Amino acid sequence: MNGDRRDPTSPPRLLVAASGTGGHIFPALAVVEQLPTWQIEWLGVPQRLEAKLVPDRYPLHRVAMSGWQGSPWQKLGSLVQLARATLQVRQILASGQFDVVLTTGGYIAAPTILAARSLGVPVLLHESNCLPGKVTRWLGRFCRLVALGMAETAEHLPGAVTRVVGTPVRAEFYQPQPLPADLPIPEGDPLIVVMGGSQGARGLNRLVAACAPAWLEAGAWIVHLTGGSEVGIPSHPRYRAFPFRADVAALLQRATFAISRAGALSLAELWATATPAILIPYPFAAEDHQYHNALAFVGRGGGVVMRESEANLDLLRQTALAWLAQPQVVAQMAANLKATAPPAASKAVARLLQEICRDSAR
């Protein structure tokens, strides 16, 4: 396809294939913000999160695609759907004369990688998780490059060309942010930020609700991002609950520590702000990948990991109380994260896309 390119002096054209959850979409958005002169279009799946986030910024193409779970007959149907989606993506790529593709994995990545390979369009695949997803494991070798959020991922991708870059987060996570005016937390008071995540927040919220009275009694403020799930703890002037907030960067920069799920994007935000964390992985994540993410984060000296269980209720309560009582321990964990944090990954991935375009034009 590249042999029939349009005017070579025109801006590079990028197709972004990122769909479903914030963990797939927000890193891609952070990357394309670094490419203001490029012509960018987006590929997603109908009725997913990208339908709310993307159309005001970039043209959005939609292709039906789902996962591989289910009976043999359902899997056969998935193969038929994959073939149909690959042909649709091939048509989008050919008619749009795209120079390069960026995908962040997930369902939409499979037809995108296959279609791009059939046309000779180079693909940069970014994998945020420590344990890569099935599409990355199966098709990473067909990509020009697989950019990794964590170094540990490379061992799972034999045959793929990999580069460790970190996981892209929005620029504000690297820039000092003022604490929002609606959170009048006095300087020096400890702050615990709880991030339930967009999926499976209910179990984590239940544990935190049971522990919060002890932390409040110890003098902490708690900002609890519930993900929309009810938590039901008594009202308290130093406890603030919100379904979501857009100013997570400011909260994490101010936090003493966080209590969080272990999605790759959440960990990247904690890493970028050097925020120590008690990690409670979502127990129903595919292939338990959040637990693997958490182990990688903890291995850098940034916190502890515990399973979601009522049996761990007292462990969670006492761990947070110990951290509140030992600020020097928390400070050391923050220093560990600062020392191991990669540079801004969004810029690194943008540079890799630029390199791929230059190499392909030769």
UniProtKB/Swiss-Prot annotation:
Keywords: Cell cycle, Cell division, Cell inner membrane, Cell membrane, Cell shape, Cell wall biogenesis/degradation, Glycosyltransferase, Membrane, Peptidoglycan synthesis, Transferase. UDP-N-acetyl-alpha-D-glucosamine binds at residues 21-23, 129, 170, 198, 290. SUPFAM superfamilies: UDP-Glycosyltransferase/glycogen phosphorylase (SSF53756). It is a peripheral membrane protein. It is found in: Cell inner membrane. The keyword Transferase applies. CDD domains: GT28_MurG. It is an enzyme of class 2 (transferase). Pathway: Cell wall biogenesis; peptidoglycan biosynthesis. It catalyses: di-trans,octa-cis-undecaprenyl diphospho-N-acetyl-alpha-D-muramoyl-L-alanyl-D-glutamyl-meso-2,6-diaminopimeloyl-D-alanyl-D-alanine + UDP-N-acetyl-alpha-D-glucosamine = di-trans,octa-cis-undecaprenyl diphospho-[N-acetyl-alpha-D-glucosaminyl-(1->4)]-N-acetyl-alpha-D-muramoyl-L-alanyl-D-glutamyl-meso-2,6-diaminopimeloyl-D-alanyl-D-alanine + UDP + H(+). Pfam families: Glyco_tran_28_C, Glyco_transf_28. It comes from the Bacteria. HAMAP family: MurG (MF_00033). NCBIfam families: murG. Belongs to the glycosyltransferase 28 family. MurG subfamily. Cell wall formation. Catalyzes the transfer of a GlcNAc subunit on undecaprenyl-pyrophosphoryl-MurNAc-pentapeptide (lipid intermediate I) to form undecaprenyl-pyrophosphoryl-MurNAc-(pentapeptide)GlcNAc (lipid intermediate II). This is UDP-N-acetylglucosamine--N-acetylmuramyl-(pentapeptide) pyrophosphoryl-undecaprenol N-acetylglucosamine transferase. It comes from Synechococcus sp. (strain JA-3-3Ab). The lineage of its organism: Bacteria, Bacillati, Cyanobacteriota, Cyanophyceae, Synechococcales.
